[in-house]
């Protein structure tokens, strides 16, 4: 059981890290491989519950990686269910600082989502996957199992290995 839980956690961390890299973070010698893998993850509609919704569904490249819909709220993976707000652009998400109070400006700076509820890109990347309205997965284990069934899972293992540096 411990090994299975560790593997699921590693899968989840790898997924989040790869998606973050694909959104514009500088990479090392395997950067292009990581970017290609991130693109696959970003567009994979099998990672939602029910299948059919990907990150790209709400963050369209044709709209600056923001929602294509011109309404205040977005429909999630389940038809007829809407989130509390529309999807913002993820175009510069890799460059947003962690949420903090700036004494000089006497204001909060950074954080992701419209309300800053996610302090970092790494934290933000997993939230839609587990949101019951957005991508509908019940837990990290469910996401990890789906990732293991993808045709690109072996690429994840080749790039990150099956270690702590891997997966969710």
What label would you give each PLM region?
Residues 1-36:
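N-terminal export/targeting leaders of redox proteins
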């Amino acid at each position: 059981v411990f090994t299975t839980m560790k593997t699921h956690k590693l899968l989840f961390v790898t997924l989040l890290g790869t998606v973050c890299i694909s959104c514009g973070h500088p990479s090392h010698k395997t950067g292009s491989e990581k970017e290609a893998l991130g693109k696959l993850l970003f567009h994979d509609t099998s990672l939602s519950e029910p299948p059919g919704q990907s990150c790209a569904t709400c963050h369209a490249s044709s709209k600056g990686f923001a929602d294509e819909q011109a309404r205040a709220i977005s429909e999630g993976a389940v038809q007829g269910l809407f989130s509390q707000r529309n999807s913002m652009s993820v175009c510069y998400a890799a460059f947003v600082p962690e949420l903090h109070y700036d004494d000089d400006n006497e204001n909060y700076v950074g954080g992701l989502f419209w309300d800053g509820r996610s302090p970092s890109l790494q934290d933000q990347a997993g939230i839609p996957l587990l949101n019951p309205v957005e991508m509908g997965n019940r837990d990290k284990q469910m996401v990890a199992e789906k990732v293991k069934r993808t045709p690109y899972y072996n690429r994840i293992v080749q790039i990150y290995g099956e270690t702590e540096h891997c997966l969710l």
